[in-house]
Amino acid sequence: MADLQKIVDDLSSLTVLEAAELAKLLEEKWGVSAAAAVAVAAPGGGGAAAAPAEEKTEFTVVLASAGDKKIEVIKEVRAITGLGLKEAKDLVEGAPKPVKEGVNKEEAEKIKGQLEKAGAKVELK
């Protein structure tokens, strides 16, 4: 039982990028695909529903790096996320890290613009 708890603790400490890489490695090892379940469910919606499903509606704003103006980026991260100073500083120094998840395209572009104006390098996923 202690071994299972250690596994849970180890998995909980992974970053989003590390978790995605782990998922890819497990898919290869076990010969499965996480996307297969989605592909099986999609045909039931019909051909007309397939086109809108391809357009991504939720985005994750990822801080790739803080750039030269780390203090400005920390201030902007605090304003966007509502995090405290220490949490925002840890997020910025731990880049690449997601700043905001599950936002629409318009909000994601707005956040990206704010962070880039502060000097950060940002990706939308």
Swiss-Prot record:
Pfam families for the chain: Ribosomal_L12, Ribosomal_L12_N
A GO CC annotation given for this chain: cytosolic large ribosomal subunit
Record bears the keyword Ribosomal protein: yes
GO BP: translation
Single GO molecular function: structural constituent of ribosome
Keywords linked to the UniProt accession: Ribonucleoprotein, Ribosomal protein
Subunit comment: Homodimer. Part of the ribosomal stalk of the 50S ribosomal subunit. Forms a multimeric L10(L12)X complex, where L10 forms an elongated spine to which 2 to 4 L12 dimers bind in a sequential fashion. Binds GTP-bound translation factors.
Function: Forms part of the ribosomal stalk which helps the ribosome interact with GTP-bound translation factors. Is thus essential for accurate translation.
Similarity field: Belongs to the bacterial ribosomal protein bL12 family.
Protein name, as recorded: Large ribosomal subunit protein bL12
Native species: Bradyrhizobium sp. (strain ORS 278)
Species classification: Bacteria, Pseudomonadati, Pseudomonadota, Alphaproteobacteria, Hyphomicrobiales
